């Protein structure tokens, strides 16, 4: 029981983490990120693009003509989302298959501005982190206690999805291991059969050779 409580606490800590970062790209460069997402889980991506200004030697808000093309592919390599957004935006999608989702971003600017340096601030929120609870409380007129219970229920639901996803990964890994072991077994049997046939053929060949030379 104590181990289960510790595991639950660790998973809650993991779920409370968020992916916030920034990276530099040129206007013709493509950057992709992999996010493991359970099925039927909401993912929200917040981003902001800044353009390098050589006069101030810093990054400034990008011009209106520069936007970001965002493409999301699921674990089956199917396109979930693909469209052009402005230089700052909020993207939301829901996963329908569990597994690795690839989020790719690149500038939609033309070659006239190629070579310019961009800084992209990126924040990826998965599951209950993607829910705006302040907005939920205002719409549904929830008290602080009711809102906290709602958050806990969403966290439990997300933990259940994570556990189901881990079972799915374990099942896939077991299937891959069993398939590999089966192929190794059949390959070993095939090698054994080939070696036996080669030995039999060599014995027949040597016997025919000795008989032809009248040594036997």
From Swiss-Prot:
<comment type="similarity">
    <text>Belongs to the EMP24/GP25L family.</text>
</comment>
<dbReference type="InterPro" id="IPR009038">
    <property type="entry name" value="GOLD_dom"/>
</dbReference>
<keyword id="KW-0256">Endoplasmic reticulum</keyword>
<keyword id="KW-0812">Transmembrane</keyword>
<feature type="coiled-coil region">
    <location>
        <begin position="134"/>
        <end position="164"/>
    </location>
</feature>
<protein>
    <recommendedName>
        <fullName>Transmembrane emp24 domain-containing protein eca</fullName>
    </recommendedName>
</protein>
<dbReference type="InterPro" id="IPR015720">
    <property type="entry name" value="Emp24-like"/>
</dbReference>
<dbReference type="Pfam" id="PF01105">
    <property type="entry name" value="EMP24_GP25L"/>
</dbReference>
<keyword id="KW-0175">Coiled coil</keyword>
<feature type="signal peptide">
    <location>
        <begin position="1"/>
        <end position="20"/>
    </location>
</feature>
<comment type="function">
    <text>Eca and bai are essential, though not redundant, for dorsoventral patterning of the embryo. Specifically required during early embryogenesis for the activity of maternal tkv, while the zygotic tkv is not affected. Involved in Golgi organization.</text>
</comment>
<keyword id="KW-0472">Membrane</keyword>
<keyword id="KW-0732">Signal</keyword>
<feature type="topological domain" description="Cytoplasmic">
    <location>
        <begin position="204"/>
        <end position="216"/>
    </location>
</feature>
<feature type="transmembrane region" description="Helical">
    <location>
        <begin position="183"/>
        <end position="203"/>
    </location>
</feature>
<feature type="domain" description="GOLD">
    <location>
        <begin position="30"/>
        <end position="126"/>
    </location>
</feature>
<keyword id="KW-0217">Developmental protein</keyword>
<feature type="short sequence motif" description="Prevents secretion from ER">
    <location>
        <begin position="213"/>
        <end position="216"/>
    </location>
</feature>
<keyword id="KW-1133">Transmembrane helix</keyword>
<dbReference type="GO" id="GO:0009953">
    <property type="term" value="P:dorsal/ventral pattern formation"/>
</dbReference>
<feature type="topological domain" description="Lumenal">
    <location>
        <begin position="21"/>
        <end position="182"/>
    </location>
</feature>
<dbReference type="GO" id="GO:0005789">
    <property type="term" value="C:endoplasmic reticulum membrane"/>
</dbReference>
């Amino acid at each position: 029981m104590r181990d289960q409580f510790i595991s639950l606490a660790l998973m809650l800590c993991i779920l409370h983490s968020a992916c916030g970062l920034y990276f530099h790209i040129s206007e013709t460069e493509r950057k992709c990120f992999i996010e493991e997402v359970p099925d039927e889980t909401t993912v929200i991506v917040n981003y902001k693009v800044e353009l390098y200004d050589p006069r101030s030697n810093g990054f400034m808000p990008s011009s209106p003509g520069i936007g970001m093309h965002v493409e999301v592919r699921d674990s089956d390599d199917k396109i979930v989302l693909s469209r052009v957004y402005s230089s700052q935006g909020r993207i939301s999608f829901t996963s329908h298959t569990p597994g690795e989702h690839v989020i790719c971003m690149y500038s939609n600017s033309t070659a006239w501005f190629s070579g310019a340096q961009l800084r992209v601030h990126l924040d990826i929120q998965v599951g209950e982190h993607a829910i705006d609870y302040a907005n939920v409380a205002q719409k549904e007129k929830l008290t602080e206690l009711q809102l906290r219970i709602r958050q806990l229920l969403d966290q439990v639901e997300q933990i259940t999805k994570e556990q189901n996803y881990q079972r799915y990964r374990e099942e896939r890994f077991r299937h891959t291991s069993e398939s590999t072991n089966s192929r190794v077994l059949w390959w070993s049997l095939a090698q054994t059969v080939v070696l036996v046939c080669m030995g039999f053929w060599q014995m027949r060949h040597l016997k025919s050779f000795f008989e032809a030379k009248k040594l036997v």
